């Protein structure tokens, strides 16, 4: 098996840049770009297979096939990406879901084991209720990966993902932050990665609870929390109840999950959106289920959102999922957030209309400062979580942190 080498470890972290038309369906297209930009997939291979994916079943078979081919050709980095993301469109009850999640992650930790064996990246498991939250911890590096001798970090960052994340996907962003002088604790919480897929712990909207567990375990204070995607709601939520968080980066506009869900399935602000919201509020379970079923039959993104949502949030049907999502919001606790906050949006986000930022700005009345940065397609960063230009995004986040810390002096 191909192994990562010491020479590879001392190279500076680099990011790919660009967005490609790989599939006519917006969510398949985005996830294929994510596969290339973040996960290590080969662009030329994906360009060939992308147009042949029309259903979730196509996605599964094509990506497993690509993973098998990559393994046969000893292209382990590509195989990790294909196996890991093959699981993405597998649904609850599919025995291959856990199988390929574990296959991809086991390959990941074997392929990059030198990072861990050398001590450059430390792993820990934080007790949380009946499970353990996995954490990767890295201290600041000088350029090319040599750890600084006793140098104080520019800041301590608590980093996590969102609704469908695997924290291994943020491995190289974590290293990039460390390479630039930051100490980083990257963790998975309930509903994410192996905490849900292997340990069986599903989401909680009370994100301050897993965050408290991590802060307590490592005795952290005065940290910056960065939450990606749904983390754009979860991280501010945690900050509302946790004074040890001094700065908040919401790496997605995310005022209210129910509104985001209905925007994606019914269209933002449309008659159908308003009707669906009213039906949910009136507890019209059978009608809501019918509406979502009809939508899911025609739209693979709605199908994925619904199936993943029922699985991740332990809902028995569409109504249960959609109604539960009203608890996943920041608007009802926004007045408790008093820290500096940066909200990051994208002008072509296929999940979240960037116009939703107004709700957040109006609700965050007591923050110390509020910065909003809208990335655009002209910067190759207009898609969800700006995955087409990660370097630009992380450089922006780091600069903001340093500005906020400088203002505190």
Where in the sequence are the language-model features?
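Conserved alpha/beta-hydrolase
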Residues: 177-194
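Hydrolase active-site cap/lid region
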Residues: 241-322, 345
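Alpha/beta-hydrolase active-site loop
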Residues: 169, 200-220
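Short beta-strand/loop motif that positions the catalytic acidic residue
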Residues: 337-338, 343-345, 349
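N-terminal cap/lid segment of alpha/beta-hydrolase-fold proteins
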Residues: 56, 63, 99-149
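Catalytic histidine-centered segment of alpha/beta-hydrolase-like enzymes
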Residues: 376-391
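The serine-hydrolase catalytic nucleophile loop
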Residues: 163-175
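Short alpha-helix in the alpha/beta-hydrolase fold that links the catalytic acid
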Residues: 173, 339, 353-363
């Amino acid at each position: 098996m191909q192994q990562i080498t010491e020479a590879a470890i001392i190279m500076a972290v680099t990011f790919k840049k660009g967005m490609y038309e790989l599939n006519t369906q917006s969510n398949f297209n985005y996830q294929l770009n994510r596969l290339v930009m973040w996960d290590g997939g080969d662009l030329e291979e994906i360009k060939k297979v992308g147009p042949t994916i029309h259903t979730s079943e196509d996605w599964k078979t094509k990506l497993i096939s690509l993973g098998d081919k990559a393994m046969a050709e000893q292209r382990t980095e590509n195989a990790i990406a294909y196996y890991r993301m093959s699981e993405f469109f597998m649904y609850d009850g599919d025995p291959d879901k856990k199988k390929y999640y574990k296959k991809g992650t086991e390959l990941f930790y074997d392929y990059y084991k030198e990072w861990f064996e050398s001590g450059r990246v430390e792993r820990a498991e934080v007790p949380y209720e009946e499970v353990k939250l996995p954490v990767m911890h890295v201290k600041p590096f000088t350029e090319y990966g040599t750890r600084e001798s006793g140098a104080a970090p520019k800041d301590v960052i608590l980093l996590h993902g969102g609704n469908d994340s695997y924290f291994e996907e943020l491995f190289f962003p974590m290293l990039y932050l460390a390479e630039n002088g930051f100490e980083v604790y990257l963790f998975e919480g309930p509903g994410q990665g192996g905490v849900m897929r292997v340990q069986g712990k599903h989401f909680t909207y009370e994100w301050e609870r897993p965050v408290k567990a991590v802060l307590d375990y490592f005795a952290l204070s005065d940290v910056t929390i960065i939450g990606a995607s749904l983390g754009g709601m979860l991280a501010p939520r945690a900050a509302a109840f946790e004074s040890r968080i001094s700065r908040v980066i919401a790496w997605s506009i995310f005022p209210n999950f129910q509104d985001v869900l209905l925007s994606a399935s019914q269209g933002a602000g449309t008659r159908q959106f308003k009707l669906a919201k009213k039906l949910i509020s009136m507890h019209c379970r059978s009608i809501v289920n019918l509406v979502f079923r009809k939508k899911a039959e025609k739209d693979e993104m709605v199908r994925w959102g619904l199936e993943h949502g029922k699985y991740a949030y332990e809902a028995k049907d569409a109504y249960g999922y959609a109604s539960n999502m009203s608890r996943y919001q920041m608007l009802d606790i926004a007045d408790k957030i008093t820290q500096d906050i940066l909200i990051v949006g994208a002008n072509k986000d296929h999940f979240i209309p960037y116009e939703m930022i107004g709700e957040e700005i109006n609700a965050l009345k007591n923050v110390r400062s509020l910065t909003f940065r809208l990335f655009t397609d002209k910067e190759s960063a207009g898609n969800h979580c700006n995955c087409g230009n990660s370097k630009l995004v992380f450089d922006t986040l780091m600069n903001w942190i340093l500005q906020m810390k400088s203002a505190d002096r």
